[in-house]
Amino acid sequence: MSRIGKHPAIALLDSGITFKEVRQIHAKLYVDGTLKDDHLVGHFVKAVALSDHKYLDYANQILDRSEKPTLFALNSMIRAHCKSPVPEKSFDFYRRILSSGNDLKPDNYTVNFLVQACTGLRMRETGLQVHGMTIRRGFDNDPHVQTGLISLYAELGCLDSCHKVFNSIPCPDFVCRTAMVTACARCGDVVFARKLFEGMPERDPIAWNAMISGYAQVGESREALNVFHLMQLEGVKVNGVAMISVLSACTQLGALDQGRWAHSYIERNKIKITVRLATTLVDLYAKCGDMEKAMEVFWGMEEKNVYTWSSALNGLAMNGFGEKCLELFSLMKQDGVTPNAVTFVSVLRGCSVVGFVDEGQRHFDSMRNEFGIEPQLEHYGCLVDLYARAGRLEDAVSIIQQMPMKPHAAVWSSLLHASRMYKNLELGVLASKKMLELETANHGAYVLLSNIYADSNDWDNVSHVRQSMKSKGVRKQPGCSVMEVNGEVHEFFVGDKSHPKYTQIDAVWKDISRRLRLAGYKADTTPVMFDIDEEEKEDALCLHSEKAAIAFGIMSLKEDVPIRIVKNLRVCGDCHQVSMMISKIFNREIIVRDRNRFHHFKDGHCSCNGFW
């Protein structure tokens, strides 16, 4: 061993030389006949296998020339394959270790790499078998193996198993604690993750990233941004992975100013902008209603993948630019990028917002005929929405009946919305009943059905719907509107008076109401589910969250700054009408992202053209 340890080739191989250089050294030693020691071969196997997964076949050829492959060489192949596109091949080399008789035995490295392979495969049964093997071979107390098992069970979504492994460790080290923080955050238990995180004497960027990502994942976007700010205060270096989570949190909140600041932070700190990070930036600007900036980032990217194109297409569709969405799709195909299933969801939405039924049908048909993509439930949902929005309700019903899979609630929701828009009571009742069969606690179905009855002043059935909700314990989800002013996020809830500036907001809203009435405003009271007089209904509508947000925006933002609002529910008819009128009376641009789409209100018009 001492002689081999002094071989100059080993020092070169361990110094991180390029694959080309490794190959040159290997060829020279092979030709000279000096490449006979199995230990030296093992170092070549490692150098080639770990350089890039595309060289794994070459590494295997080197291994096959070894008379007695070492455990080091076989472990290197397991390690390389566990991080490759084919992690299942790791087990081929594990079986070679077992078939060697008593010459070789798996060690803790073998087991750790196999656990990582299971993590890549996301196969529960295989993972359990490997865990059992670690116990039988006495490696279950190895800290590297334990950390790997925590990551494996987190990947499988088995948080209880993560806790069992973690609790079995007498003194978990820094790496193990970080893995557990990551596991809990990934599985949605941000409370325990934060508790463990706060108790760590030192925290590396991985732990910080896990907390930011975890909060963003469960929708606690404000807390995700708070952790990011704490990370900066403690001087922890922020990387591109963390910035993706930060940008995602800004996107959820519709916090465009903070998103812009995060973008400038990336540029100031020279964080490498990968395709994934740039795609997240496109998504941020698109979902905050700034399509101009989204497309600026998009066209400025040197490299784009199918997800980048799909993100831009989705942004254009969401913001009501259906024709531009279809133009971009044509450019995408001309650029040689093959669309995937996600792409077609965006394309079909683009057709829907501009009412291009025939073109939408052609794109739907091309999925299978031209690209070999089998349409899934979401694609059929888009097709139903396309026909329903265009008023072709019978065709929409026919598509639902002929779908190869059972329609989900969102499909019936599209038909229900259209039934109300086109005043088809019979189909509206059918769609709502189908929705409630699938989701008995879906408050939206009850509300829309009651609105359909209210449109025709059928207060007996409105009352029946309300009683049905009450008897089943279904409550209408309270409306919440979020907006950002000077980098600070403000939340407004329906009927809530807790905002510190409520008195000023109320005064501004009263002035807005006065000017609306002078302009001829008459409240659309159909969203109010009670048979009460019109004045009481108007009072109820005044409490809607986006109206408070608009009032706050008018009093807080300069006239040339758009008022941007994110709402958790679909905008009601009255708020939609009011927003259009305010945009004209006050000469303000108002951008509302509700649960369905964007509404760009300007000069008394909305980008949705009355259908949302």
Swiss-Prot record:
A GO MF label: zinc ion binding
Region (Type E motif): 411-486
Pfam families given in the database record: DYW_deaminase, E_motif, Eplus_motif, PPR, PPR_2
UniProt repeat feature PPR, residue ranges: 70-104, 107-141, 142-172, 173-203, 204-238, 239-273, 274-304, 305-339, 340-375, 376-410
Highest rank taxon of the organism: Eukaryota
Region (Type E(+) motif): 487-517
Keywords: Repeat
GO terms for biological process, alphabetical: RNA modification
Region (Type DYW motif): 518-612
Family of the protein in this entry: Belongs to the PPR family. PCMP-H subfamily.
NCBIfam families: PPR
Name of the protein this chain belongs to: Putative pentatricopeptide repeat-containing protein At5g40405
Organism: Arabidopsis thaliana (Mouse-ear cress)
GN (gene name): PCMP-H14
